[in-house]
């Protein structure tokens, strides 16, 4: 239910006699006859809609115009590869824009549960205000599977403001190297399209890894840019040549040490790159974005007890507590779902969890209240989570 902040409709007064307005007020400052008439008209409408506000009815008619919740309307769905689609979205009026390389979180309702996932914004500069995200279908991925199989043009999705530090520095004075693998190409494509659209004279080399040529997302556009001389493109097909070994960069990109490098892809690839740049003493020239946590062998699992709502779930050792909880209808805080933002952190009063990225086990004795990231933690025995 929606409720007004002031059921009497009266406004508090400052010592000067002027109304005090809070964030819930929908009025403009008084001063002209026109604004007074608007205020009176609004008050009349407000009387008819109580206890809702007029804006709540606007939300029903046009959900993109609400000032309280950010949503987007799907304008177009484009098939990129067999398992990748690009979704073009018209964000609501409260969208604050984004920097190339950032991501937005998209929320959809699946079986009565709202699930969120982070997707990189892949569109370049546009005059129509639309943005695009590119989604690769993941085996067992609830949201990516839903978007591929059920999303339709015209559908409304939940959104959050853009986030992320995988962006070009404002004062960049070096040539650029983009090292990407699989769907890790998506934030790099957002950067690349921006530099091309803005007519920036930037020396860019992209080395992209994918299993086969037909698995390369944006392949046609990348090849066109390479033919135009806007990009030096190197493709590595891992089914044939295996994963990239960083030592190969000396022959593939001889001047890589002079370039600012942006890397995004599987965790194993990023770990090797970080170690290589560290050994070379150039770690500050490498910016990484991990789009999917690296999982280790499943543990034994256990019973998770959410103490405040008194609900117990049997959790295996292969999946995050967050995912299992949401599927069971438990409303849990969440964020990036990659172990980066700490938006999912909850206190563990007692028990043990295993970090799915590293295999490290975190334990809590009775009453400890150890903070755990539920998006990358699996049950490693019985545990109690304060929620």
Task: List the predicted regions and their residue ranges.
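Short, low-complexity N-terminal leaders and the immediately following helix N-cap/first helix
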Residues: 1-84
């Amino acid at each position: 239910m929606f409720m007004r902040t002031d059921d009497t409709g009266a406004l508090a007064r400052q010592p000067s006699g002027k109304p005090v307005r809070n964030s819930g007020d929908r009025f403009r400052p008084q001063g002209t006859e026109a604004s007074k008439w608007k205020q009176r008209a609004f008050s009349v409408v407000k009387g008819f809609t109580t206890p809702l506000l007029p804006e709540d009815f606007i939300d029903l008619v046009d959900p993109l115009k609400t000032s309280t919740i950010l949503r987007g309307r799907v304008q177009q769905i484009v098939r990129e590869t067999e398992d990748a689609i690009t979704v073009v979205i018209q964000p609501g009026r409260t969208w604050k824009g984004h920097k190339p390389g950032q991501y937005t979180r998209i929320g959809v309702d699946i079986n009565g549960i709202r699930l969120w996932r982070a997707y990189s914004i892949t569109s370049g500069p546009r005059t129509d205000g639309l943005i695009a995200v590119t989604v690769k279908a993941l085996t067992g991925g609830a949201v990516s599977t839903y978007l591929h199989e059920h999303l339709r043009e015209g559908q409304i999705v939940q959104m959050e403001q853009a986030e992320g530090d995988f962006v070009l520095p404002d004062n960049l004075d070096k040539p650029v190297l983009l090292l990407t693998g699989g769907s890790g190409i998506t934030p790099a494509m957002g950067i690349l399209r921006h530099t091309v659209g803005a007519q920036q004279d930037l020396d860019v080399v992209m080395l992209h890894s994918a299993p086969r040529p037909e698995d390369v997302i944006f392949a046609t556009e990348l090849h066109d840019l390479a033919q135009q001389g806007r990009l030096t493109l190197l493709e590595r097909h891992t089914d044939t040549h295996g994963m990239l070994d960083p030592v190969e960069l000396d022959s593939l990109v001889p001047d890589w040490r002079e370039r600012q490098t942006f890397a995004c892809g599987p965790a194993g690839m990023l770990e090797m790159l970080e170690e290589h740049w560290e050994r070379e003493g150039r770690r500050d020239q490498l910016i990484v974005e991990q789009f999917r946590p690296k999982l280790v062998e499943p543990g034994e699992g256990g019973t998770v007890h959410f103490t405040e709502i008194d609900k117990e779930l049997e959790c295996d050792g292969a999946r995050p507590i967050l995912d299992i909880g949401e599927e069971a209808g438990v409303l849990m805080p969440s964020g990036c779902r990659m172990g980066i933002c700490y938006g999912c952190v909850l206190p563990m009063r007692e028990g043990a969890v295993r970090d799915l990225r590293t295999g490290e086990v975190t334990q809590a004795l009775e009453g400890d209240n150890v903070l755990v990231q539920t998006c990358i933690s699996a049950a490693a025995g019985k545990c109690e989570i304060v929620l």
